[in-house]
Amino acid sequence: GQYMYMQSTYNPAAVGDGDLMRVYGSHRMHFTGIMDAPMTTYFSFSSPFVVGKTQHAAGVRFMNDRFGLFSNQSLHAEYAYRFKLGKGYLSVGADFGFINLSFAVDSVNLKEVADLVQDHAYHNASDNALPEKGGQNGVSGMGFDLGAGVYYETATWWAGVSYGHLTQPTLQWSDKAEVHVRGTFYAAGGYNWRLRNKQWLLMPSAMLQTDFVGWDVNLTMMAQVSERYRFGLGYRLAGSVNILLGMDIIDGLQVGYTYELPANGLIRESYGSHELYLAYGFNILKPKRTNRYKSVRYL
């Protein structure tokens, strides 16, 4: 639901957008009410900087995903080079880092073959699909990851395309078990429409993502009032409706919340998903102004 606030997660060209250093953190609880439902924690730091007369930005991001017996951690460094083009600024960026995927094989429900029919266990001890135990914490595999993208922004609209997991890393758990990470294409864009009374700003946006096997689309309409309060609605074609809220607590400090309600069969099992984020923008070095547009996603 918060894709417009954390664009460098999927497009490194959007890192360091604006004139401020930024710290961003979020925590998401997916599908509450379902046992062992996924949980995602995300953290990032980014900063623009100037070298001579050229404009750059760099950052780092970390994500920790837990879903059932799986745990996924990723750490990436991000860089973007930006320059004036037409009425806006074009950024070209890349990120690189590592993905680590763990599986708690010791926690799999193992039963003897004779018990399978009665107890409906998922596996038996001789199941070749299970990776060999890799110690107290199960098994894990790590791979090098690379992504790239372009991003364009003017005073009234923005758009970007990117491709994540260019290396399509294979995470090796054992000689018999491995996980292949598919490359993913993203396209996102939005428009900023200031109403006549100047107090209201409407911000429709959309994002498409696909690994060329499956695909999903996010559609969002956000409104901002008095340069401080934000609220909106979103819809995912994969099957959910989002309610988004946010506000500036003090100058530079933002807090936001998203509630995602399933719009499919999951609604009978889950109370929905909750996401909370906190973002802070600050300026320690006080560089010379570059006259880049102030990002409406981090006001």
Predicted regions and their residues:
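Subset of outer-membrane beta-barrel
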Residues: 1-299
